[in-house]
Design a protein with these regions (language model features):
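Domain-scale detector for complete catalytic domains at protein termini or as standalone homologs
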Residues: 1-92, 96-266, 270-275
Length: 275
């Protein structure tokens, strides 16, 4: 896959220095943009290309109204991924992005274009009921900000800068509406599903993470990292080392190569599944 491959609008590529074997389409948390993945290029093997999704209402698409319904978001993503030149790809999503990634995976499987793996980070399985205290999109501004801070639902820069919050509040609210009004049902994607959690993440319990097992009859693993809900920033290199191992293993499986079996059971401490 050449590094000069032209990708459609809405996908921000952080290309490698040589031809890549696979892409990782990355979906951010609520209110996040493609820029949160910019530092991943040099922390992943050159054989993997980071393709960050830029949805309307943020980053280079800030002037466009943010989407508030999951079907509209996934329709947009199916078009974007479909316009990419053929190549093996995995889907990675953090928090709300994991829910979007799961629905995108379902749609792509139905279309006969399955990803080689789904990696769901810092997110309860999407078919679980949303706790009442986590339904936020209708709250007034100040109450919404306080609730997000209390739930550790804001990245550090947003907690430190209220002007930043005011700028992106419509996008955050739209993303929350998209997630909180969406109801999923368990469906076997028939692809590997790997879950990442934060040891101090109060938003996602162990049971919430284990429930992702309902979305695959193939490989499943859970890995816990140091940090809270935004451990992908505080434990970035450890996360990316694990992500690279997942994608490389999934490529080998897709090519029919022999690999050691991954354990499905959760182990204590940090490692809970695939080695």
């Amino acid at each position: 896959m050449p590094e000069t491959t032209r990708l459609p609008r809405g996908i921000v590529s952080f290309p490698t220095d040589r031809h890549a074997d696979a892409r990782i389409f990355c979906l951010p948390y609520a209110g996040g943009s493609a820029s949160i993945f910019a530092g991943w290029r040099h922390a992943l093997p050159a054989s993997l290309e980071v393709c960050a999704i830029e949805l309307p209402g943020r980053g280079s698409r800030f002037a466009e109204p943010a989407l508030t319904h999951m079907d509209a978001v996934v329709d947009e993503l199916v078009r974007m991924v479909g316009d990419c030149p053929p190549a093996p790809f995995a889907l990675f999503g953090h928090s709300m992005g994991a829910v979007v990634a799961a629905e995108l995976a379902r749609r792509l499987v139905e279309l006969g274009r399955p990803p080689i793996a789904l990696v769901a980070s810092a997110c309860a399985a999407p078919h679980l009921p949303i706790r009442r205290e986590h339904v936020l999109h209708l709250l007034p501004r100040d109450a919404l900000i306080e609730a997000l801070i209390h739930l550790d639902g804001l990245p550090p820069i947003a907690r430190e800068r209220r002007d930043f919050l005011d700028t992106f509040m419509p996008t955050i609210r739209a993303d929350l509406q998209c997630r909180e009004t969406w109801r999923s049902t368990p469906h076997d994607l028939r692809i590997p599903v790997h879950v990442l959690t934060g040891a101090d993440d109060g938003l996602v319990s162990e049971a919430d993470a284990l429930a992702w097992h309902a979305f695959t009859s193939t490989e499943f693993s859970i890995r816990r990292f140091d940090g809270g809900h935004f451990f992908i920033h505080s434990a970035m290199q450890a996360v990316l080392d694990h992500l690279a191992a997942i994608v490389q293993r999934s490529l080998a499986l897709r090519h029919g190569e022999s690999v050691a079996p991954a354990r499905h059971a959760c182990a204590p401490d940090h490692d809970r599944g695939m080695k």
